[in-house]
Every structure is written in structure tokens, then in C-alpha cells.
């Protein structure tokens, strides 16, 4: 599939992975209200790779995710953006349909005789086995995000985009969700681009951490820390300090 909107060329399908990249972005420009939100941005994500994206508010993180997901066709832009057609998106708000039970939320849009079985398996994977008939209102915020993850991964996407998916959760629930998300991604192996404001979250989850500044990728470094990634290790502290310094935040112990 190919589309050209305002000078931005987007391609998808099998060609997206011919060069062993799931996402490839070259010289991407996005203009909103006369301001260049993304300015000559370049980024590549390999199959199964987990990339976290940091940056100040207004740096263009959500704009980048929307561009990759092709959710903003009316925005002026240019450059090359290659991504697969089968993309799932997880938002900070779980966005469950309140009038549908959990299983119905998960299998929404799925087809085939095994759709319900796949939905049940997906709910079991996120620790909600036996809750298929529950209503979204009966769940905590963390449980609702578990359903959102199940709904995204039941489709076995090549690419998972996540826009601050745990931003509204308490600290303990966030830690539990980090563990769950890593386990799910290791099992399903999508490429992942996750936006966050939390440096510790970025380090905990990522194979690579990138920082977006003034519409460009200013930092893109691998996270070469073995699990579990503990705050007290010198390697963790050095990486955390480096990222915080680039973001203009003084490190605290």
C-alpha cells in the first residue's frame, strides 16, 4: 500500500520488512499550525525490537506515533515513512467500550471461527482468565489496561505503538505492567515504539532509548543491561544520569 498526503510518502505491507526493519523513517517532516513539529526525523526499528521514546511535552512524540499509525492524513508533511499495515495502538486511556463485555472488547473486529478462542487466550495471557463476561466498569485502571494490551496483541501485529500506556496508573501497578508487557512482547515479538515521560520506565522496558528534541531524534542508545534492571547498579545509574542530563533534569538518588 502506498499513499502520498501533502508530500509525505507512506508505504506498508510486506515491503516494510524486506530490509529487516519494521519501521523506517527518513527525513520526516510534519507541520502543524505553521510549526515544524517533526523536522527531518530519522528512525529505524527492527522486527521484535522494543524502542522507548522520551522527550519534553510538545517535542512531537505523539505526532510521530500518529504519523506511523497513519492517523493524521490531513497534516502537511514530507519524507519517507515505511511501516507495516498490521499496527496496533495502545493509549493511556484503555478506550474499552463500556457497553461490551471484556471478551467482546478483545475480539472486536476479529474474524474467523477461532476468534473467541483467541480472545480467551489473550485475556488469560494478561491474567484475566475467567473474567470474560465482566464489564469494563468492574475493573481497576490497571486491569483495563491489561484488556487493552490483550486487544492489541490478539491480532499478532508486526508493530505495537504505545502512547504513555501506564501514565495514569499508580507506581506499583506500573511496575507490574512493565513486567507483563515485556513478557507479552517476548512471546508475541512485535516491534514496539512506546512513548513515555518516565526515564526509569524507558530503561526498564527498552532495547533502545531515543530522545526527541525539536522534532528530531537527538539521542538513540542501546540499553545493554541484563534483567532484572535494578536502580542500584552503576550501569543503570550511569545510563539514567545520561538520559536525565540530556532532558535537562538533575539526577537524584
Describe every region a protein language model picked out:
Residues 54-56:
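The feature captures the beta-strand-to-loop junction immediately N-terminal to the Walker
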Residues 69:
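Helix-to-loop junction immediately C-terminal to a conserved catalytic motif
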Residues 135-139, 143:
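Conserved ABC ATPase signature
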Residues 149:
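Hydrophobic anchor residue at the start of the ABC signature
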Residues 154-158:
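A short, proline-enriched helix->beta-strand linker immediately N-terminal to the Walker B motif
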Residues 160-163:
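Catalytic Walker B motif of ABC-type/P-loop ATPase nucleotide-binding domains
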Amino acid at each position: 500500500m502506498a499513499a502520498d498526503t501533502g508530500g509525505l510518502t507512506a508505504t506498508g505491507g510486506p515491503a516494510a520488512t524486506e530490509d529487516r526493519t519494521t519501521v523506517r523513517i527518513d527525513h520526516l517532516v510534519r507541520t502543524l499550525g505553521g510549526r515544524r513539529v517533526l523536522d527531518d526525523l530519522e528512525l529505524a526499528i527492527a522486527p521484535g525490537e522494543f524502542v522507548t521514546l522520551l522527550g519534553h511535552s510538545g517535542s512531537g512524540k505523539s505526532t510521530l506515533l500518529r504519523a506511523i499509525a497513519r492517523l493524521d492524513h490531513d497534516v502537511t508533511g514530507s519524507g519517507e515513512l515505511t511501516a507495516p499495515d498490521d499496527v496496533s495502538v495502545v493509549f493511556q486511556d484503555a478506550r474499552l467500550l463500556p457497553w461490551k463485555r471484556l471478551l467482546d472488547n478483545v475480539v472486536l473486529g476479529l474474524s474467523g471461527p477461532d476468534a473467541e478462542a483467541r480472545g480467551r487466550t489473550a485475556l488469560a495471557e494478561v491474567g484475566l482468565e475467567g473474567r470474560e463476561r465482566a464489564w469494563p466498569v468492574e475493573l481497576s485502571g490497571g486491569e483495563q489496561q491489561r484488556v487493552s494490551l490483550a486487544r492489541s496483541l490478539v491480532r499478532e501485529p508486526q508493530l505495537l505503538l504505545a502512547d504513555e500506556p501506564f501514565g495514569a496508573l499508580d507506581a506499583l501497578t506500573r511496575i507490574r505492567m512493565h513486567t507483563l508487557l515485556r513478557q507479552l512482547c517476548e512471546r508475541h515479538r512485535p516491534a514496539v515504539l512506546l512513548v513515555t515521560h518516565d526515564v526509569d520506565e524507558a530503561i526498564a522496558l527498552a532495547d533502545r532509548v531515543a530522545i526527541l528534541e525539536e522534532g528530531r531524534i537527538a539521542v538513540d542508545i542501546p540499553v545493554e543491561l541484563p534483567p532484572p534492571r535494578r536502580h542500584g547498579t552503576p550501569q543503570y545509574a550511569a545510563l539514567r544520569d545520561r538520559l536525565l542530563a540530556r532532558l535537562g533534569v538533575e539526577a537524584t538518588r
